[in-house]
Regions:
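HhH-family (HhH-GPD) DNA N-glycosylase catalytic core used in base-excision repair
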Residues: 1-259
Length: 259
């Protein structure tokens, strides 16, 4: 499948959107960005107001790409609503066209469990290793790609296999969470229609056996809600976001470092 999207009058920057740390499987190959989305290879190239799309699947149509890249979000209205001082104005100008990516809930959850206390290069390497060891093989244009493994596949994997992928202590968390998702103790697909507060409570629930989703704290939960479950009121705060807010908006924090 090959087609173009006309993005005239639509603020969009492909590189800003794919390289900001919200998604980890995209790689630049010459002038194209390439990744596996769900069960298909997708190649994207932006040329001014045109977005070129090549995919291994005939079901990769304009609707699929628009949904994944959230092209239909009213970005100008959103930016106007937050452009209230010079700090935000500078950020908006520097990252013009950056959009959220609508990811698969399971892949998003697993990816951000891997992302804890790791830089982006390390996260990408871990996820690439997991896909190579456990994902389904796809051949496209003479190149081999791998899907992100379903929760059931990771749940049946040996812990040492995940450790060998570079996960370290995260292997235990990912394995246990994959088991909970595979056994349907938490059904991620059902959370998209629920309210933010309810979803957050579910993702962070503690049971008599410990956390229902090991490895999921407030930041991971907010990432999953924002990037895959349509919770646009979620606001993930990692150490870098916290430092930035404390620098420019210190009045938003009290003396409790957990807020």
């Amino acid at each position: 499948m090959e087609f173009q999207l006309n993005l005239s009058d639509i603020p969009f920057n492909l590189e800003n959107s794919l390289e900001c740390g919200q998604v980890f499987r995209w790689k630049r190959e010459n002038s194209w960005w390439v990744a596996v989305i769900d069960d298909r290879v997708v190649k994207l190239k932006q040329e001014d107001n045109l977005l070129n799309v090549i995919s291994s699947s005939d079901s990769t149509n304009e609707e699929f790409i628009r949904k994944y890249l959230r092209i239909n979000d009213p970005l100008p209205d959103i930016l106007t609503s937050i452009n209230r001082d010079h700090v935000m104005a500078t950020a908006i100008h520097k990252l013009i066209g950056l959009r959220l990516i609508k990811q698969s809930p399971w892949e998003c959850l697993a990816s951000f469990i891997c992302a804890t206390y790791k830089n982006i290069i390390g996260i990408k390497n871990m996820i690439s290793n997991i896909c190579f060891r456990l994902g389904q093989r796809i051949e496209f244009e003479g190149i081999i790609y791998y899907t992100f493994p379903e929760a059931e596949i990771i749940a049946s994997a040996d812990r040492h296999t995940l450790e060998d992928c570079g996960l370290g202590y995260r292997a235990k968390f990912l394995l246990e969470t994959a088991n909970r998702i595979a056994s349907r103790e938490v059904i991620l697909e059902n959370l998209e229609s629920a309210k933010y507060e309810n979803v957050r409570e579910i993702l962070l629930e503690n049971t008599d056996k410990g956390k229902i989703l090991p490895g999921v704290g407030p930041k991971v939960a907010d990432c999953v809600m924002l990037f895959s479950l349509e919770k646009l009121d979620a606001f993930p705060i990692d150490v870098w976001i916290r430092r930035t807010i404390q620098k420019y908006y210190p009045f938003l924090f009290d003396n409790d470092s957990n807020h």
